[in-house]
Amino acid sequence: QGYSSAASDVYKRQGIFFGLPTQATCNGLYDRLYEWASSVSDETVNAIRLAHGGANYNKNYQQQVIQGKTYVYEEEIDSSVYVHPWFQGNKKALLADFVIGTVDQFLMASLRRKHFMLRHLGLSGKVVIIDECHAYDAYMNQYLEQSIEWMAGYGVPVILLSATLPLSRRKELVNRYIKGIRRNRPKIEKQKPTVSSDWMDNISYPLLT
């Protein structure tokens, strides 16, 4: 929460996407994200979305869905964070301000399919957090790397969480993000690095890259 808040402040982002490996972990963290989002949304009204195939079976989430005819900006609601039915469709899931969902919601940003630009639009204004990034197979890693490159091109801060990510894999992911930045901002290629790269070979734990 501290890292995401700092990134939101620095990059002036308007929300968070939190990608987790399973529906169970999403459900377990949903209430915590809702509580945190409410604490940082005192002066604004924001939408939250639980994005996975079993979201309709989460009782807490369904109890927070406001009625379709409720006009949030005209009628007083109990919380500064709400679940609006407009965001319930798969196409518009990532357009909510705060989204917690299975990691495939993020990986599909690199899958050519209908309405994929709505997914890019939803992610482009957020801080992206991906948990357990060491646990994916070779197939998922290809989509992870490509999605990270897309986010770098949009200037989206990406936070990857892992307790056991190998040094070599960390370098690959960081270099892929750098590639996305340089592809969209060619002048960066000519700039000299201003920060020491010693951390690239650092194996201490915990490590913030």
What residues fall within each predicted segment?
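Conserved helicase/translocase P-loop NTPase motor core
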Residues: 91-122, 126, 143
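Single conserved hydrophobic/aromatic residue that forms the stacking wall/gate
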Residues: 1-7, 11
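Conserved Walker A/P-loop ATP-binding site and its immediately adjacent core
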Residues: 15-36, 52-55, 169
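Interdomain hinge/linker at the junction between the two RecA-like core domains of SF2 helicases
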Residues: 172-209
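SF2 helicase catalytic motif II
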Residues: 119-144, 149
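Conserved helicase ATPase motor motifs in RecA-like P-loop NTPase domains
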Residues: 148-178
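A substrate-engagement module of RecA-like helicase motors
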Residues: 31-98, 103-107
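Catalytic acidic motif of RecA-like/P-loop NTPases
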Residues: 104-107, 133-137, 163
